[in-house]
């Protein structure tokens, strides 16, 4: 199926603004370590099927894995958050691995792809906020705030790995099937879907955990 090739929203080619990795760190008042504290890195980074080489993933039950290997944020979305938070946004604050210029998270759908050099990423799911995220932001209400904003971050699988660095141009291609955007996926996350809606989700290259949930719901319906 043919994919639509996109350029940046303002007519300029997209590019990698930042690549971010982190080490295991303890949250204040918590006994466990987290990899959410990420910082922009200089120079080239290898991205393989598990994500950015050298990046810490502490809670493997909910983070990381082949269908959640790279967490992407769009610069237009982060500009919005900067205004919302009333302070400059530092890359890595939300725990993202990659920031892409001229990209609004709300426009991205499951199955869309990001391509640069040898690297090919495919969108699988949206970021769902958790208590660790709220603690990172030092705001106990941040889960509700992030959900209400309806601009969730973007999880990707690695179709083909490669070495990348900040400043590299990024090509963006749209999934040719029915769109399941990040805001829609966030709104329906974990819900029981019926009929055409379930079929539409299963027709997209969605995160394997969501696929398993939807397939189990279909089995229960029979």
Segments from the language model and where they lie:
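Residue-level signal for inorganic ion chemistry
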Residues: 118, 167-168
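Active-site glycine-rich loop that binds ribose-phosphate moieties when present
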Residues: 137-144, 149-158
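Short alpha-helix capping/helix-loop boundary micro-motifs
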Residues: 100, 107, 153-160
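Loop/turn positions that initiate beta-strands
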Residues: 111, 161, 166-167
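Hydrophobic, well-ordered secondary-structure segments
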Residues: 152-155, 167, 182
């Amino acid at each position: 199926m043919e994919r639509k090739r996109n350029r940046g929203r303002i007519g300029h080619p997209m590019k990698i603004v930042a690549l971010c990795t982190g080490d295991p760190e303890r949250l204040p008042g918590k006994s466990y370590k987290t990899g959410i504290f990420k910082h922009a890195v200089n120079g080239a980074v290898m991205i393989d099927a598990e994500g950015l080489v050298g990046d810490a993933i502490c809670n493997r039950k909910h983070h990381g894995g082949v269908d959640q290997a790279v967490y992407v944020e769009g610069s237009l979305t982060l500009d919005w958050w900067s205004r919302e938070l009333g302070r400059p946004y530092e890359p890595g604050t939300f725990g993202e691995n990659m920031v892409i210029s001229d990209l609004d998270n709300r426009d991205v759908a499951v199955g869309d792809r990001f391509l640069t050099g040898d690297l090919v990423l495919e969108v699988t799911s949206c970021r769902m906020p958790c208590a660790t995220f709220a603690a990172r932001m030092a705001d106990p209400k941040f889960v509700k705030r992030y959900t209400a904003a309806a601009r969730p971050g973007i999880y990707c699988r690695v179709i083909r790995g490669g070495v990348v660095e900040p400043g590299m141009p990024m090509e963006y291609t749209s999934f040719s099937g029915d769109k399941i955007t990040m805001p829609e996926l966030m709104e329906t996350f974990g819900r029981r879907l019926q009929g055409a809606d379930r079929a539409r989700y299963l027709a997209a290259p969605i995160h394997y955990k969501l696929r398993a949930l939807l397939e189990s719901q279909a089995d229960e319906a029979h």
